[in-house]
Each structure stands twice: as C-alpha cells, then as structure tokens.
C-alpha cells in the first residue's frame, strides 16, 4: 500500500474550481490532493512580433511557485533577477501542451497568456498546471465566442497530464512528493482526450527501466489521463 493508502492506479482526489478569480477571462483552482495551483487565462488583442501580420494567434504560459508553497521558504525568482531552468522548462511545457489542442489560425491575431501559480506543492505541479490550464483556456475562449469575436471555440481536443513512476519496483500513478522524492523512475505524460501523445518526460533516478516497464507506465498514464479528461468535461458542464 502507498503512503497515501491509494492503489497503484489511483489518482489523488482531483478538484477543478472554475471562475476562481474575478478579473481573468478564465481562471481555475486545480487541486491534486495537497497540490494546489491557480491557473488564469488572459486574452491580449495582440500577438508576439514574430506573428504580426500572419493571421495566427498564440498561446503561451508562465509558471511560478509562491515562496512558501514548499516545506521551506524559497526566495522569489523576481528577487533573484532570473528564472531557474526548471521554471523555464515547465512553462514551455505548459505552452506547448495547450497549443497542441488549439487551432491558432482560427484564434486570429490575439494571444492568450496562461499563468500557473503554485499555491501549495506536494508533487505533480506541472501536470496539475496543464490539466487546470486547459479549463481556464477553454473558458477564456468561450468568452471570446460569447462576445462575438470568434465564430467558434478554436480548441480541437482536450488535454491533460499526469505523473507516473516506479516506486519499490511497482508502477504507480500520480506521485505525491514523498513518492516522487524516492522513486526509481519518474515520468510525466501529456496526452489529448483522443489519446494522442504530446509529451513524455521520463528519467531513471537509479536503476534503468525496461521497455516493458515503460509500456506499463504509459498505459497507467493513459488511463489516468482519461479520468482527468472526464473531470474536465464535468467541470465545464457545470454552470
């Protein structure tokens, strides 16, 4: 049995709370167990310079952690004057994942900026960010449809992400911090609602993993992401 008393293929309790803030066009508080991330989507009626005049839009993301999101306080990156490599990697991953399910030509010459701010971290912050950011982006784009600025929502599919890993020789789903810090293999998987793979990030922390174990982890992630997509659909079906 895992430290959280979950089965190997069991997600932590997941909650998606829409319209969590007042000002952003889309906002979601996403909770994966004790990991909590505030995701907002802000619409800008302009595009980056490299897209000007090309008739296409853009979706980008920024990611950060509150100083006391972790067990001990971390200095704000703004105070240090630069972002860490980890932060840059995660925000690029979030942006890539969302752009994979948006028809950027249909979006028109506008940009949506996703902000993912980790309020409390207990493992899986990047996967929670992607899963919550999808819902925030969906709401922001629906707002453009309601305002008559878009004929239809340009999102082409759902997208969600989950962590998997090998802990004490057993493939497990949705690692918390305790498992993540002591696992043999750590992997993050991003997939669409229709089963397309967007990204797989996998590392052997100690003993190399086999192709059979890799396949088992992907299968575990695919099933978990399927459940997350159902939760996204349920959240979006709410008033």
From Swiss-Prot:
Entry EC no(s): 2.7.7.56
Pfam families from the UniProt entry: RNase_PH, RNase_PH_C
Reactions it catalyzes: tRNA(n+1) + phosphate = tRNA(n) + a ribonucleoside 5'-diphosphate
GO molecular function, one term: tRNA binding
Superkingdom classification of source: Bacteria
Keywords: Nucleotidyltransferase, RNA-binding, rRNA processing, Transferase, tRNA processing, tRNA-binding
Residues reported to bind phosphate: 86, 124-126
GO biological process: rRNA catabolic process; rRNA processing; tRNA processing
Function: Phosphorolytic 3'-5' exoribonuclease that plays an important role in tRNA 3'-end maturation. Removes nucleotide residues following the 3'-CCA terminus of tRNAs; can also add nucleotides to the ends of RNA molecules by using nucleoside diphosphates as substrates, but this may not be physiologically important. Probably plays a role in initiation of 16S rRNA degradation (leading to ribosome degradation) during starvation.
Sequence similarity: Belongs to the RNase PH family.
Subunit comment: Homohexameric ring arranged as a trimer of dimers.
Protein name, as recorded: Ribonuclease PH
Encoding gene per record: rph
């Amino acid at each position: 049995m895992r430290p959280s008393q979950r089965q190997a293929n069991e997600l932590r309790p997941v909650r998606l709370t829409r319209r969590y803030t007042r000002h952003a066009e889309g906002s979601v508080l996403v909770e994966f167990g004790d990991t909590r991330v505030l995701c907002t989507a802000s619409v800008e009626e302009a595009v980056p310079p490299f897209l000007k005049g090309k008739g296409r839009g853009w979706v980008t993301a920024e990611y950060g952690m509150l100083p006391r999101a972790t067990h001990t306080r971390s200095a704000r990156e703004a105070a240090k004057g630069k972002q860490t490599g980890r932060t840059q990697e995660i925000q690029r991953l979030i942006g890539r994942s969302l752009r994979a399910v948006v028809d950027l030509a249909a979006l028109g010459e506008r940009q949506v900026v996703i902000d993912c701010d980790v309020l409390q971290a207990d493992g899986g912050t990047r996967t929670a960010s992607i899963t919550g950011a999808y819902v925030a982006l969906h709401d922001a784009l629906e707002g453009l449809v309601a305002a008559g600025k878009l004929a239809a929502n340009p999102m082409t599919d759902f997208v969600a992400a989950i962590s998997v890993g090998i802990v004490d020789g057993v493939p497990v789903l949705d690692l918390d911090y305790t498992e993540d810090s002591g696992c043999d293999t750590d992997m993050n998987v991003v997939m669409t609602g229709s089963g397309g793979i967007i990204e797989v990030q996998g590392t052997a922390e100690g003993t190399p993993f086999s192709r059979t174990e890799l396949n088992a982890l992907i299968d575990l992630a695919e099933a978990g992401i399927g459940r997350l997509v159902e939760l996204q659909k349920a959240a979006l079906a709410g008033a």
